[in-house]
Amino acid sequence: QVEAEWLLIKDSPSTITLEELKRTSSYFTPPTYEDLPSDESTLQSLRSQNKAFSNWVQRNVRPHKMNGYAIVTLSLKKTGVPPGDATADQIDFVADLADRYSFGELRVTHEQNLVLADVKQSELLALWEELKAHGLATPNIGLLTDIICCPGGDFCSLANAKSIPIAQAIDRKSTRLNSSH
């Protein structure tokens, strides 16, 4: 059935031409990166001095294609808050962080988290400290508590069930299990 559908649409007006692809791609230019050395030894030193920072780096920071930069995922899964939920003040704060740390770019993921895609490794500690002060440094990316949850009956008029209480119960149970080990 997929192949039949493809034959119907492959040359239709909705197919993007190479010219249109080039035109739209021109709006997505990479930032002007600095030529930075990879700063792994300094980062490792900072991690060895601060267990909470180290845990956050391990869970929320990923390698970047450019030396000296990192990709940072901001978890919107703090215990006690509906998964993926953020206040207007938090979004304003994160937008300011994006301006200061990530070329003004902030991404929203399908996992209900936020990403600062171009953070200098040398600024990770300062970024973490700001996130921590605003309750946005939850180190749980990829863990059970990084729950993707439909807002369900709590926020959606189309829903026929509430899913947030279930997600919060899983989070509480997992948090208790983690704290006992």
Question: Which residues does each PLM region occupy?
Answer:
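Peripheral terminal and linker regions in Fe-S/redox and tRNA-modifying enzymes
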Residues: 1-180
